[in-house]
Curated annotation (Swiss-Prot):
UniProt-annotated location(s): Secreted
Annotated tissue distribution: Expressed by the venom gland.
Protein name according to UniProt: Putative venom toxin Ts29
Nucleotidyltransferase in keyword set: no
Primary localization class, coarse: secreted
Organism (species): Tityus serrulatus (Brazilian scorpion)
Single GO MF descriptor: toxin activity
UniProt superkingdom: Eukaryota
Keywords: Secreted, Signal, Toxin
Keyword Signal in record: yes
Signal sequence region: 1-20
One Gene Ontology CC term in the entry: extracellular region
Length: 70
């Protein structure tokens, strides 16, 4: 295995498993009150998570969806 192949494999794997692939970096999670979530449990305290886009429009998504530490 060439060193270049290994580097590409690691980079690709890291990219696909990072939250950057699932959620754009300019998005963040907050709970229903608009308070930013620190972790999945906090996001899901009210059984729903809220995804806030850069325009601060919130919409509910199923509990656990894209609830990642920011």
């Amino acid at each position: 295995m060439s060193p270049l192949f290994v580097v590409l494999l690691i980079a690709t794997t890291t990219f696909y498993h990072s939250d950057a692939f699932a959620v754009k970096r300019d998005h963040h999670m907050c709970d229903r009150t608009g308070k930013a979530c620190l972790n999945n449990a906090e996001c899901c305290r009210n059984e729903k998570c809220v995804l806030v886009d850069p325009n601060i429009r919130c919409f509910t998504v199923p509990c656990g969806t894209a609830c990642v530490k920011r």
